[in-house]
Amino acid sequence: MPVKMVAVLGASTVLWILFAVSQAFKIEISPEYKTIAQIGDSMALTCSTTGCESPLFSWRTQIDSPLNAKVRTEGSKSVLTMEPVSFENEHSYLCTATCGSGKLERSIHVDIYSFPKDPEIQFSGPLEVGKPVTVKCLAPDIYPVYRLEIDLFKGDQLMNRQEFSSEEMTKSLETKSLEVTFTPVIEDIGKALVCRAKLHIDQIDSTLKERETVKELQVYISPRNTTISVHPSTRLQEGGAVTMTCSSEGLPAPEIFWGRKLDNEVLQLLSGNATLTLIAMRMEDSGVYVCEGVNLIGRDKAEVELVVQEKPFIVDISPGSQVAAQVGDSVVLTCAAIGCDSPSFSWRTQTDSPLNGVVRNEGAKSTLVLSSVGFEDEHSYLCAVTCLQRTLEKRTQVEVYSFPEDPVIKMSGPLVHGRPVTVNCTVPNVYPFDHLEIELLKGETTLMKKYFLEEMGIKSLETKILETTFIPTIEDTGKSLVCLARLHSGEMESEPKQRQSVQPLYVNVAPKETTIWVSPSPILEEGSPVNLTCSSDGIPAPKILWSRQLNNGELQPLSENTTLTFMSTKRDDSGIYVCEGINEAGISRKSVELIIQVSPKDIQLTVFPSKSVKEGDTVIISCTCGNVPETWIILKKKAKTGDMVLKSVDGSYTIRQAQLQDAGIYECESKTEVGSQLRSLTLDVKGKEHNKDYFSPELLALYCASSLVIPAIGMIVYFARKANMKGSYSLVEAQKSKV
């Protein structure tokens, strides 16, 4: 056989063997090895095979007990269903699968347990503060009991724990309990009582392994401290009314019940409200009244005795024993008879003066109306009431007063810091003014107080004034000036009649610390801008006024802005500028001098008598600057060895008896703070003539020089004019240009 054919057959054989192995007969069971089921639930065990198309299945227990289950086989799968699970199902189950001559087995152990319900909490009675109570935690229908643990918590506190591991193993459902006795306190209200049961079996799902019951504690307090309040009194007049209020402490809040004790000690129920009101009382309503507080766990009661007395005959007059009446008002005096059905009334004054009023009688009342009360109505009035054979009198005093308006505050002028001011408080149309008191306050400080007790009490309306002087300060701003008028009425009223006026204080402060800022400087070059800024302190804020001081001392107003601005200054703007801070309290003034400096212009350099003089002549060289009076004039004589500054007086320099060496170039420099300007001229000094026919070498040299000077002078004049146009001139520059 060829080698290739052998290789192919060998490979085919190997593949067939591998395929046969992969299709081998196998058995599986689920759940694997071990499982657990709760009594009463349904449990299914599944046995399945692979590698066999039509296996045969059989189920049995390891000890050949009855299955207590149903078997359902379908194809390569067989299901053993226990429904419901019971103690008889706690076995090792074997599944046998047969395929031809092959036979396979798998076993699984089934454990059972019972933990069907949450634990129960039971109390021996209601939870009453201070009284012991037993709480029981029940775990019903437990199996196996020896794996049970019960915990009892109050809030976060563990009260007790019990493990039942020492219990004997019996195949039955048992109910186990844990008991704890404790004394409730008020702080237990709202806490949770937790009964927690745990069954320590590993295979149980964590949610089934532990069960708990939570019960919020409701703590009770039996009724106590039951009290009764009675208004107006326990002793009452016939026809009167009484209100009795009962309160009782407890938890839950006690219900209130009112009753009355009868002669046989039986309680007659009257009301289920906390308040019991009795009206139009009669003498037979006297007796003992009982209030009882009742809640779920107890009751508590309190008693009060009411005594109803026979109604007496009483006379009452209103508004009272003393009445204050303002002049012009109306007064109504009412006299009432209490305890008499048909009284008769009469009115009179204590001095038997005319009544000046209208009397009206109606039933048990009589009124005296005094219209538009005047001084003549100031009396004691008596009301006499006759009932059967008995007569009673009641007196009232009518006192007349006048106090119609609030006081008026006036000041002698505006309030200025540090300046005395007089203030007066006027109270108009007062009576009786000998009972008047006026007080003047600044803030909480009394400036002055006066009683008018020493003045004669005459029956007339008068106006009274309190006057004082004080010095305001800035600290008074925001305070109030209060004029307080009190009219004391003796015993007529507990408090005097009072009126007041309030005036807020606003203290002015005269302008001060007026300050001027000049930017950039008070000394400026003509054409420069400048800002003059002024500030002044005061209350109210001062108004700023800028003025310029004229030569005669008068002020010329310029602006009311804080800043005075010159965009381009001129020489005429130089002068004294005045800033005034002005408000109602005064004026503060500050001044500054503005100096506008001008560059030198129109400089003139002259020589007298001429630019060409003879030896021995007197020569005056003068330099003036027409546009700027305050300028420095410097005269110099130019020389190769250096310029020589000449001692000039007011810009003039005098050469007496001129010499040949005085000839040369003279320069004038005009200087100010902001600039300078130059001018120059040439002085020619000629020697004295001795012989007309003699032509000395010196004269020859002078002649030659003069022939050069004339063109030079022309050039100097040209450049001088050009320099005047620019504002400066340099002879040296001119000569350089010439060369």
UniProtKB/Swiss-Prot annotation:
Residues annotated as glycosylated: N225, N273, N424, N531, N561
Disulphide connectivity of cysteines: C47-C95, C52-C99, C137-C195, C246-C291, C335-C383, C534-C579
Classification via CDD domains: IgC2_VCAM-1, IgI_VCAM-1
GO molecular function: integrin binding
Gene3D superfamilies: Immunoglobulins
Cytoplasmic face of the membrane: 721-739
Top-level taxon of the source organism: Eukaryota
Keyword annotations: Cell adhesion, Cell membrane, Disulfide bond, Glycoprotein, Host-virus interaction, Immunoglobulin domain, Membrane, Repeat, Secreted, Signal, Transmembrane, Transmembrane helix, Ubl conjugation
Transmembrane segments: 699-720
Extracellular topological intervals: 25-698
GO BP terms in the entry: cell adhesion; cellular response to glucose stimulus; chorio-allantoic fusion; embryonic placenta morphogenesis; heart development; heterophilic cell-cell adhesion via plasma membrane cell adhesion molecules; leukocyte cell-cell adhesion; visceral serous pericardium development
Signal peptide: 1-24
Modification after translation, per record: Cleaved by the metalloproteinase ADAM17 to generate the soluble form. Sialoglycoprotein.
Expressing tissues: Expressed on inflamed vascular endothelium, as well as on macrophage-like and dendritic cell types in both normal and inflamed tissue. Expressed in the bone marrow.
Entries under PROSITE patterns matching the protein: IG_LIKE
A cellular component term, taken from the record's GO annotations: cell periphery
Entries under InterPro entries matching the protein: ICAM_VCAM, ICAM_VCAM_N, Ig-like_dom, Ig-like_dom_sf, Ig-like_fold, Ig_C2-set, Ig_I-set, Ig_sub
Residues annotated as domain Ig-like C2-type: 25-111, 119-212, 223-309, 312-393, 408-506, 511-595, 600-682
Subunit structure: (Microbial infection) Interacts with ECMV-D capsid proteins and acts as a receptor for this virus.
Role description: Cell adhesion glycoprotein predominantly expressed on the surface of endothelial cells that plays an important role in immune surveillance and inflammation. Acts as a major regulator of leukocyte adhesion to the endothelium through interaction with different types of integrins. During inflammatory responses, binds ligands on the surface of activated endothelial cells to initiate the activation of calcium channels and the plasma membrane-associated small GTPase RAC1 leading to leukocyte transendothelial migration.
The protein's name: Vascular cell adhesion protein 1
